[in-house]
C-alpha cells in the first residue's frame, strides 16, 4: 500500500528514508550476507536520522510517530533494496517496554534507545522444543530474594550478539501449577551484554539468509527482580505480535528484496545463477 496516497505528509518520510538508503547499494548487502555481518553502518545511519526511534514518544527523546508512519519507513527501506530487520525489531520490542514497562524502566532505557546509546533488538522467545508452541517453552526464571535465576536456552534469536538489551520470555510458574495455559509466563527486560560470560553464552547460527541469528544459553543467570516487565502473557505478547506481523507485511510490500526480483527478474536470475556457479566452482576446486 502507498500510504502517501492517504496522507501526503508521509512523503517527506519516504524521501528522507530514500536518501539514507541511497548510500547502501546492493553490493553492501551482498557483503553483509556473504560474511553473516550485521549492517552496522546502515543501522547507524538510520539511527542518526531518528528512524529507529520513530515510535518512541518525544517525551523520551523519540520522534513520536504512529504505526502508519513506521510502516512507511519499513516499506521504503525495502523499496530501495535494503534490509529493515534491525529497524522493525527495535520498533516492536520497544513497544512492549513503552506499553507495559514500569516508569523506572521507561525512564532508564527509552531515552538511551532513542539516542542510539543502547540497542534493544533481541527478543528471546523461540526454543529448540517450542517453535510455534510458545506455551511449551522450558526456560525458567525462579525467584530468589531480589533476583531471578534464569536457566534455559533460546534459539533463532536474531541480533542477540549486537543488542545491548533483550526482552526475555521465561516461565516463572511451572506449567502443571497454573490454571490457564497462558499463565506462568513472564517477560523480562535484561541487560544482555553485561551478562555475557556471567552465565550467558551467545553462539551465531549460520543460515541461508542473514538475519544475524543466534542461540542463547542461560546457565543459572542472576537478573534483578526489577527487570520484570509483566506476567500477563496475553496482554504483553499478543499485541506486539500483531504489530510485528504488520511490520513484516510492510517490508514485503516494499520493492526491495521482494519487489526488486519482480522489477528486474532477468538480472535477478542471472545474479543468482552466477553466484551459485561460483560457489560450486570454489567448492570443487578446494577438494
Predicted feature locations:
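A short, Trp-centered hydrophobic/proline-enriched beta-strand micro-motif
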Residues: 116-125, 169
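Short linear motifs in low-complexity or flexible loops
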Residues: 252, 261, 272, 276-277, ...
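A short core secondary-structure module
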Residues: 151-199
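Amphipathic, small/basic residue-rich leader segments at the start of a protein or domain
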Residues: 1-87, 104, 108, 112, ...
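Flexible, small-/acidic-enriched active-site or ligand-binding loops
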Residues: 136, 194-222
Amino acid at each position: 500500500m502507498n500510504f502517501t496516497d492517504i496522507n501526503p505528509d508521509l512523503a517527506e518520510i519516504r524521501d528522507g528514508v530514500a536518501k539514507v538508503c541511497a548510500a547502501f547499494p546492493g553490493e553492501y548487502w551482498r557483503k553483509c550476507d556473504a560474511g553473516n555481518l550485521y549492517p552496522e553502518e546502515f543501522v547507524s545511519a538510520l539511527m542518526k536520522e531518528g528512524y529507529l526511534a520513530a515510535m518512541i514518544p518525544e517525551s523520551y527523546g523519540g520522534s513520536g510517530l504512529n504505526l502508519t508512519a513506521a510502516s512507511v519507513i519499513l516499506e521504503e527501506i525495502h523499496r530501495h533494496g535494503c534490509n529493515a530487520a534491525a529497524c522493525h525489531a527495535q520498533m516492536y520490542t520497544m513497544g512492549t517496554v513503552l506499553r507495559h514497562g514500569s516508569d523506572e524502566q521507561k525512564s532508564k532505557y527509552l531515552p538511551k534507545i532513542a539516542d542510539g546509546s543502547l540497542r534493544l533488538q533481541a527478543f528471546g522467545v523461540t526454543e529448540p522444543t517450542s517453535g510455534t508452541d510458545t506455551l511449551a517453552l522450558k526456560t525458567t526464571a525462579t525467584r530468589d530474594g531480589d533476583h531471578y535465576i534464569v536457566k534455559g536456552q533460546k534459539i533463532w534469536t536474531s541480533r542477540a550478539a549486537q543488542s545491548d538489551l533483550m526482552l526475555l520470555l521465561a516461565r516463572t510458574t511451572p506449567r502443571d501449577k497454573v490454571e490457564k495455559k497462558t499463565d506462568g509466563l513472564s517477560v523480562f527486560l535484561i541487560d544482555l551484554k553485561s551478562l555475557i560470560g556471567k552465565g550467558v553464552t551467545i553462539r551465531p547460527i549460520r543460515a541461508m539468509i542473514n538475519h544475524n541469528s543466534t542461540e542463547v544459553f542461560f546457565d543459572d543467570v542472576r537478573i534483578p527482580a526489577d527487570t520484570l516487565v509483566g506476567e500477563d502473557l496475553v496482554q504483553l505478547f499478543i499485541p506486539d505480535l500483531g504489530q510485528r506481523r504488520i511490520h513484516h507485511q510492510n517490508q514485503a510490500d516494499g520493492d526491495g528484496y521482494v519487489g526488486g526480483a519482480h522489477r528486474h527478474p532477468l538480472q535477478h536470475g542471472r545474479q543468482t545463477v552466477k553466484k551459485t556457479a561460483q560457489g560450486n566452482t570454489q567448492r570443487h576446486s578446494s577438494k
